[in-house]
Amino acid sequence: MVKRQYQVVWTKRSQQQIKTAYNYMKEESLSNAIKVVEDIITSVNKAITNPEFYGPDKYKINNDGSYRAFEKHRYRIVYRFTKNIIRVLRVRHTKMEPKPF
């Protein structure tokens, strides 16, 4: 059986958040900044064939199960999957307070 492939789409907000994180990290170490961003992207891509790979987002109010989240290198990544799309919604450092959504 062939597994369905989902398309990953980064929202403008999540693109800006990962870019901001990268720019902050590269001030200390360019190689670490590159590694962290690559690891986050690789981790997101693990959900391409199974969007339920990561657990439900525990901070999402009234989560129907389509909002998922995971942590990588002290960053929390939130995405939502629908029919054929995995939409990355947020990338934030775990020291930041989560905003209700």
Where are these regions (language model features)?
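Basic/aromatic recognition patch in beta-strand/loop cores that engages polyanionic ligands
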Residues: 53-84
